[in-house]
Each structure stands twice: as C-alpha cells, then as structure tokens.
Amino acid sequence: MERSITEKTLYHVAKSYDNRFVLSCSFGAPEGMVIIDMLSKHFKDFSVCTIDTGRLPQATYNLIDRAKEKYKFNLDVIYPEFDLLQKMINEKGMNSFYASEENQQECCNIRKVLPFDKYLKENKAKAVITGLRKDQSETRKDTKLIELDKYENCAKINPIYDWTRERVMGYVEHHNVPINSLHQEGYESVGCAPCSRPGIGRDGRWWWLNDDAPKECGLHFDKGGGI
C-alpha cells in the first residue's frame, strides 16, 4: 500500500540522519499529527518541537496535551526572545501585524523564524521533518521530499509532500489520529488565534493581506517564494 511506502521512506530517511532529526509540528494542521503517528510506530524515543508564539488558540494547547499523552514523544517548546518581542510591541502595539504585510512578516520573524533557527543551531539538528504538501498552496507547489537549502547544515524532509488533503484525512480517520478541534469548525489551517479564521487550505491565514501575498510565516519559505 502507498501508506506503507511513505512510512518506510520516513523510517529510512530518519535512520540516515542517525536519528539526529526533529519533527516540527504546529499542532494546527493534521499533517503533522499524521507524521507523529507514523514515527511512533518505528521510534520509541523521538522529539517533536513546536513554537509557542504566545498567541495560539486554546484548541492548539489542548491538542498538544492529547498528542503527548497518546504518543509519549519528547516535546521541545520554543518561545520567542523576550527582548525582541517586547521592543516590537512597545514600538508598534500588540496587533501591529494587521497594519501591513511588512509588519506581519516582522511579527512572524520574531515569534517564529528567529526562535526556530536558534533552536536548530543549539541542538545541532541534522534534519527537520515537516508536514508540508505540494497542494497546500501556490507557494508550496514545488515542495520536494528532501530539501537542503533553507536551514544551515540541516536538511528539510517532507515525507507526505505528494499527498492530497483527502489522503491525509483518510489516514487520520483510519488510524484514529487526534487533530485540532478547530478543523471541525472549518479551519483547515490553524496558526495564531488573531491570524486564523475558517477557510479552505491556507485561505484563512492572514486573510487581511492581498490575495497575491504569500501566506507564509517564513519558517519554511523565504519571503516571496518557495525553496
């Protein structure tokens, strides 16, 4: 079956990096939970990292606890650097991201990108596993299984890059994988609470931006396009 092929690929990729890999999971999309479920079948001891921006909805925190209880993974919670966050808020306010795309990118950079880059360097990770898929958005259409040019000295592995959403949700149902409760309210993608609303794909993310603006925070893609 195709799913078993994906699981074998994930297993061999993880082994090829001497288990020095980390799964990056937002707990705001079902893809990350699918990969956690797959990893749990082959590794008793693996790490999941997630970024707590300070603006996440309660449903996301609830899922983190449910997933931790079911799969028993090691959880690393990454937080923004206090001084940078404080400076931005004092200069531009709590919700500066609504004012412009530039402010949105600045907020995402401080709350997500910089803390994540620091985490990878400090932990000397050789590979980051993500739940990116090609059909999630126009920005992600060129996503590949293995990508090498985003993170310094660290590969990015996208084991379900060629899956459809229907296949993801089929796996969730068949394997009883816990997912964010906001998906039942029409959110296909959940990020920070003030930056997410119900929508297909990533349409509900940063909805106030122009339609041609990349709906990306910068974690996986540089501003203006994919890898």
Task: Write out the residue ranges for each language-model feature.
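Nucleotide-activated chemistry modules centered on ATP-dependent adenylation/adenylyltransferase
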Residues: 1-227
